[in-house]
Amino acid sequence: SFFEQNXKIVYVARNAKD
């Protein structure tokens, strides 16, 4: 679903940023 994908993207983005 969109929310599941979005959450995953956010998780990866935060990890990459950190």
Curated annotation (Swiss-Prot):
Q: Localized where?
A: Cytoplasm
Cellular component GO terms, alphabetically?
cytoplasm
Q: Which UniProt keywords apply?
A: Cytoplasm, Lipid metabolism, Steroid metabolism, Transferase
Query: From the Swiss-Prot or TrEMBL record, what is one GO molecular function term?
Result: aryl sulfotransferase activity
| Top EC class of this enzyme | transferase
- Give the principal location in a single coarse category: cytoplasm
What reactions does this protein catalyze?
A: a phenol + 3'-phosphoadenylyl sulfate = an aryl sulfate + adenosine 3',5'-bisphosphate + H(+)
Q: What does this protein do?
A: Sulfotransferase that utilizes 3'-phospho-5'-adenylyl sulfate (PAPS) as sulfonate donor to catalyze the sulfate conjugation of phenolic compounds.
Give the similarity note: Belongs to the sulfotransferase 1 family.
Q: What is this protein called?
A: Phenol sulfotransferase
Q: Which organism is it from?
A: Ictalurus punctatus
